[in-house]
Each structure stands twice: as C-alpha cells, then as structure tokens.
Amino acid sequence: MTQENNSKFNIQHSTLDLAPIVLFVYNRPDHTKQTVEALQKNKLAIGSELFIYSDAAKNENAEQKVNEVREYIKSIDGFKKITIIEREKNWGLANSIIDGVTKIVNEYGKIIVLEDDLVTSPYFLKFMNEALEIYKDEEKVWHISGWNYPIDTKGLDDVFFWRLMNCWGWATWADRWKH
C-alpha cells in the first residue's frame, strides 16, 4: 500500500481509497494516447483502477480508427488494474457516459471521469481524490471539476465554488449522481 501525505489538507492517500478512473474513448488514437500518457504521469495512477469504455464505430468509415484505439488500449499499463469495456454497437457519447458512470459510481461510491481528448496535469488525480475526500459530506457540492472557463481569479483561492458543471475532467459521488 502506498501512502502520500499532503500537509495542507493532512490527507493520507492509500491505494484502497482512490476513486476509480473511467475513460471514454472512440476513434481518436492519437488523442487517446495523449490522454493516457498524461494520466500515467500522475503518482496516484499506479494505485488507481482504470475503466475504459470503447464505443463501437457508427459506420464503416470509423471502424479502422476504432480498431486502432482498441489495439492501443490493450497495451496500456501503469495502473493498479485496467478493465476494458468494448461496446459491440455504437452507443453514442451521452449514452455511454450515463451507463458507464452509473455502473462504476454505484459500485465504488465515487468516480473520476475523462474523455479521450483531455490532457491532465501530473497532479490531476491527487487534486481529484483530495477534493472527493474533503467535500464528500458537503451535499451542496455535486461534482469536482478539473478544468474551468477562463475567469478573473483575483481574490479566489486555488479551489473555489462555481455554479456550473464542466465536463472536461470531473469527479462525483454516487449519492450526487443519482440526482
């Protein structure tokens, strides 16, 4: 079991309490590779479970790229455990996310969600897992965002509350997802 101490929040991370990561991929092998490589640079990746939902091709034109993505994701390492879910028919992004997030968050109680075109910071998993722990009992916090629209940050802390949902790297809990 690995442990990491963050003196600011005094949070102990262990491989037993890290949120699972769910990555949704389709037909962009280069983007998918960049997303995974960025995640692998996170210290907490090795202790995290990664679930990859690979949607099926919409049509014949997409089949080659979908197959390239599927070949690549089978070669991934650097995580505690990797589970690949290959859709046999095309679900579309929205349906795939709803289904995948619902299944995983109901099983684990919390979740980190990414799509195949995001490049995260080496501290992304640390930030998300710490925020999930800090705000788990704060029912007014429905999700944690890893990205924000460009705003004037003068007077704001590194972490602040925002009334909008951002879908470019986010996390939530099972009880909030049910709403």
Language-model-detected regions and their locations in the chain:
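Short, basic, low-complexity termini and linkers enriched in Ser/Thr/Gly/Pro
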Residues: M1-D17
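An acidic/histidine-cluster motif and surrounding catalytic segment
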Residues: L16-V113, L118-H179
